Amino acid sequence: HTFVDLKSPFTLSNYLSFSSSKRRQPPSLFTVRASDSDFEAAVVAGKVPEAPPVPPTPASPAGTPVVPSLPIQRRPRRNRRSPALRSAFQETTLSPANFVYPLFIHEGEEDTPIGAMPGCYRLGWRHGLLEEVAKARDVGVNSVVLFPKIPDALKTPTGDEAYNEDGLVPRSIRLLKDKYPDLIIYTDVALDPYSSDGHDGIVREDGVIMNDETVHQLCKQAVAQARAGADVVSPSDMMDGRVGAMRVALDAEGFQHVSIMSYTAKYASSFYGPFREALDSNPRFGDKKTYQMNPANYREALTEMREDESEGADILLVKPGLPYLDIIRLLRDNSPLPIAAYQVSGEYSMIKAGGALKMIDEEKVMMESLLCLRRAGADIILTYFALQAARTLCGEKR
């Protein structure tokens, strides 16, 4: 209705009468618009264009008391009253780029379901692994971390298979890099998948976990992974001094570009059970409390943080995630380095179980838990929900 037929003499009155008419005629091929000054003159003359009326005040339910407005200056709810405002003022965001996808691999061809972790599998390294990575990349997840299920026959007290350059992890890294050169591959550096004792280090006759001898083995493992093409090696063993020794070993072999993500604050948690089932890596005796941190301790995380920083760590990780939000925030507030959080198998399985029993909304709880880890200060999150959450973020539920 802002067009005037050039066959008729153009006047403002003609225009206004045309605008208010109910006729539905298509405009002629050649049309002109009234000028801004014409519109302004019409408004000044009192010919105000029609617009929707002022909306009525919404009715309150019957029985609502009539009270004076509270004498308060700030009403935080004003900034929450619409989706657009809530989105504009959102302080924390979540993106598929924030996720590192943990993948279990094994020597077989079949993808084997993990009973305690619904939706997770031990992937065949030749095919299942490539297919799962392709799915993740399709929704923006381009970082993975590999965890191997090692045959019992290859496990030894000193975990020598950990640095076999033709072993399962180095082979898988080479395969992935050949197919997806830009994929970021994190690796786990620890002896427990390779140890006949199921511990992260070499076990002495009296049950003591040997620190320095274990670090020697871990350095060889990290170098083997770097040589295969790993982008980030991630010592999860909690041995003292391993980050510095690993940095020296990597640099000596020409891998100055390979990063170290240290499991800085890895707690001796009960949330790891499903993971150990997935890898068949439960300790054959005892527990891991002499090297993993006491869940009761807070300040100790600062000690570990300072050591890892001074030894050359590039990323600091907290494990588990959601029960240790205070530790994530502690590291975030005291270190300039990137912070990672590991949403571990127990956290994942609890959400899955609650969802399956219809006790919670699985998708909403999943997304809230990940957002909370980000809000606490995590730059990246290792999560078994990586693919599912990324699909949700992309609006693609499959």
Curated annotation (Swiss-Prot):
Cystine pairs annotated here are: none
The UniProt catalytic activity note for this protein reads:
2 5-aminolevulinate = porphobilinogen + 2 H2O + H(+)
Organism, per UniProt? Pisum sativum
Q: What is this protein called?
A: Delta-aminolevulinic acid dehydratase, chloroplastic
Residues engaged in binding Mg(2+): E304
Biased composition range(s): Low complexity: 60-69
Functional note: Catalyzes an early step in the biosynthesis of tetrapyrroles. Binds two molecules of 5-aminolevulinate per subunit, each at a distinct site, and catalyzes their condensation to form porphobilinogen.
> Which GO CC terms are listed, alphabetically?
chloroplast; cytosol
Q: In which pathway does it act?
A: Porphyrin-containing compound metabolism; protoporphyrin-IX biosynthesis; coproporphyrinogen-III from 5-aminolevulinate: step 1/4
Its quaternary organisation is: Homooctamer; formed by oligomerization of dimers. Probably also forms lower oligomers.
The record, for PROSITE patterns, names: D_ALA_DEHYDRATASE (PS00169)
Q: What is its EC number?
A: 4.2.1.24
Q: Which family does it belong to?
A: Belongs to the ALAD family.
Keywords, A to Z, come to: Allosteric enzyme, Chlorophyll biosynthesis, Chloroplast, Heme biosynthesis, Lyase, Magnesium, Metal-binding, Plastid, Porphyrin biosynthesis, Transit peptide
Q: Cite the record's Basic residues compositional bias ranges.
A: 74-83
Residues bound to 5-aminolevulinate 2: S345, Y384
Bias category Pro residues: which stretches?
A: 50-59
Q: Could you name the active-site residues?
A: K266, K319
Recorded superkingdom: Eukaryota
